[in-house]
Amino acid sequence: MAPPRRKATRKASETASGVSAPCVEGGLSAEPSEPAAVPEAPRPGARRCGAAGASGSRREKSRLDPREKPQVRARAARAEDQAEGPAAPTADAEPPAAPGHSLPRASTRSRGTASSARARRPQSGPPEGPGLGPRAPSPHLGRREEAPGAWKPRAVLEKLKLSRQEISVAAEVVNRLGDHLLRRLNSRESEFKGVDLLRTGSYYERVKISAPNEFDLMFTLEVPRIQLEEYCNSSAHYFVKFKRNPKGSPLDQFLEGGILSASKMLFKFRKIIKEEIKHIEDTDVIMERKKRGSPAVTLLIRKPREISVDIILALESKSSWPASTQKGLPISNWLGTKVKDNLKRQPFYLVPKHAKEGSLFQEETWRLSFSHIEKAILTNHGQTKTCCETEGVKCCRKECLKLMKYLLEQLKKKFGKQRGLDKFCSYHVKTAFLHVCTQNPHDSWWLYKDLELCFDNCVTYFLQCLKTEHLEHYFIPDVLSKQIEYEQNNGFPVFDEF
C-alpha cells in the first residue's frame, strides 16, 4: 500500500497581526534559530520526507551522503584541572527538548570559505557527549582585575527580584486558569480525558526575571504503546503511530493514514480552550492569534494585570528515550550518574511543533521536549545535596542564568531587529549556561562571593559560541552536526534566509 500523503503548508509571506507568543523556554515554542529538519538521500522503502514530499514540490536532496564527510570536530582532551570524583545525587536543559541550535547569522553573506569556517570551530568539550562547543574558563583559575567603576551584579539582581505581592496575585490567577481548563479537558465529552497539568518554564524554575508576567502550562496526555518514526533524520521531530490503538479510542479521529496528526490534535485542543475561557469567572482572558509553527496556545490575561500564559499540549511516553538522546544530558560529572539514570527513567514528551523545511511545515510531526528535566536540574543544581539549602553553602548558578537572560533581554530591547537579535531566544542562553555547569561541575567553582567572575565565565563561553556559530543542544547533541552537513552538501542555503 502506498504511504499516506503528508500535508504541508507554506509559510505566510507576512506574519499575522496581533501579539506573538513569547519564546517558551524548554523548547516548547518556536525558537527563532531552530534548524529545519534535515533532508537525507531517499532510501528504498523509506517514508518520503518533508512537506515537499506531500505537495509534489520536493527540495533538492543532499548531493553527498553526510556519512561520507570526514569528522569535522575532534574530541578535546579533558583539561588537566578538571577535578574528578564521585558526585552526590542531585537533580538542564528544554529542554526539553527541542532541536539543536545552529546560532542565527547576521544578514551579510561575507563569511569566508567553508574551510576557514571549519577551521574556526573549537574542539569538543568534556568526554561525556560528542562535543559541547568551546571550553568554558574555570573560576578557580584566577580572578580578573576589577575595572574602575565596574558594574555591580548584585545591584542588578536586586532590581530583577520579583515582588512577593505580584507573585502571589499572578500565581493565583494563573493557577485558577489552569485548574479550570484541566477540569474541562478531563470532562466526559473531551477527547483529551486523562490529561494532567505540568507547570514548567522560568517561573517554576525560579529563574524568572523582572516581572511575573509569563507562565507556561503543559497539559500532558499519556499515550501508551506508541511507535516513533524519525522524520528525515532530524533527531528531534517524529511521526507518532500506535502499536495497538483500542477500538473506540477518542484519538481515532486524529489519525491520518495510521499517523497521529499533530495539527489535528492542536486544532481541537485550541478550539476547546477558546470556548472554555469564555466561562472563567472573574478573569478577563483572551486568546492570541495563532503563531505559525508554535506548539503553544497563548492566552492573555488582561486583569488585574497583563499576564501571558502559554498552554501546551504534550504526549507523554514512558518508553525509553529515543536513540538521538543517547549522548545527551552530560551531567554525570556534575550531578552524578545515579541522578542521570533516574532522570532518564522519567517519561519524555512530544509537543505539536511542526518540522520545518525551507518555507514549508510538516504538520503531522511532533518534537521532543524535556522541559520537566530542565526544571528538575535547575531545582537541584548542586553537586552536593545541600547546595543553596538553608544549612548549605549558597552558589551563584541561578544568579548567573538570570543575569545572562537579562543581558539578552536588554540588548533585544535596545537593538531589536536592527542587528538580528530578534533571532535569539532565552533558550540559547539557557543551553549555553547548562554547558558551562557541565564543564565546571564543582560547587566550589560557583561560590556566591565569586558571582562577578562566574558570570563573566558564562558570558565568555556564550561569546565563543556566537563567534564559532556552534551551540550544541543539551539533550540531542547530533542535531546541529546533521544540519551543518546538509548545509555544506547543498551550498549553504541558510545564508540566503537572513
Swiss-Prot record:
Cofactor binding mode and count: Binds 1 Mg(2+) per subunit. Is also active with Mn(2+). Mn(2+)-activated enzyme forms an inverted pppGp(2'-5')A intermediate, suggesting a non-canonical but accelerated 2',3'-cGAMP cyclization without substrate flip-over. Mn(2+) ions are coordinated by triphosphate moiety of the inverted substrate, independent of the catalytic triad residues.
UniProt modified residues of type 5-glutamyl polyglutamate: E275
Parts forming coiled coils: none
GO terms, molecular function: 2',3'-cyclic GMP-AMP synthase activity; ATP binding; chromatin binding; DNA binding; double-stranded DNA binding; GTP binding; metal ion binding; molecular condensate scaffold activity
EC number: 2.7.7.86
CC terms in the record's Gene Ontology section: cytosol; nucleus; plasma membrane; site of double-strand break
Listed Pfam families: Mab-21 (PF03281), Mab-21_C (PF20266)
Record region (Disordered): 1-150
Site (Cleavage) residue list: D310, I311
Bias type Low complexity, positions: 30-56, 84-95, 105-117
Binding site for Mg(2+): E214, D216, D310
PANTHER family recorded: CELL FATE DETERMINING PROTEIN MAB21-RELATED, CYCLIC GMP-AMP SYNTHASE
Protein family according to the UniProt entry: Belongs to the mab-21 family.
Protein name per the record: Cyclic GMP-AMP synthase
Encoding gene (name): CGAS
